[in-house]
Amino acid sequence: MNKLMLSLSLLLIVACSPVAQEHDDLYGSGFINVNEMQWSLEHSSPYPFTVAYGEISCGFHPAFGREVYFAPEGFTDESYIGTPLNKAAANALKYDDMHSNVPYSINTGADLSVAVNIGLKVCDEQQESLKNNV
């Protein structure tokens, strides 16, 4: 009986111990916060989004490459899928039979090239972090 209790106790201790996640933030995606006021100071192109605050994020799809998305403030946790800003993101969503679930927040006729380049830069920085830290 004592061996059984000892075994169960040891199993519970091991099973409930937290796993070290020192590289959890280097999963391969990244983001940058953007806002209308700061955009006008840093970029010559007009702010392309209909909301004052949001997040440009980047991820990687094995078949389509680097994906760039925009999510308005309040829709940026992992349960949301942002609006795709580049072809890779749109193709990845279509391929995976997924859809954006955030409010569409892109100005009509907006030039998204600067926003996409910002997202791709985030991808580059994240990949560099992965190379240097793993």
How would you describe each model-predicted region?
Residues 19-69:
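N-terminal secretory signal peptides
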Residues 2-9:
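Sec-dependent signal peptide recognition
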Residues 14-15:
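C-terminal motif of bacterial Sec signal peptides marking the signal peptidase cleavage site
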Residues 92-134:
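C-terminal partner/receptor-binding element of secreted or periplasmic proteins
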Residues 5, 45-47, 112:
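Residues embedded in well-ordered secondary-structure elements
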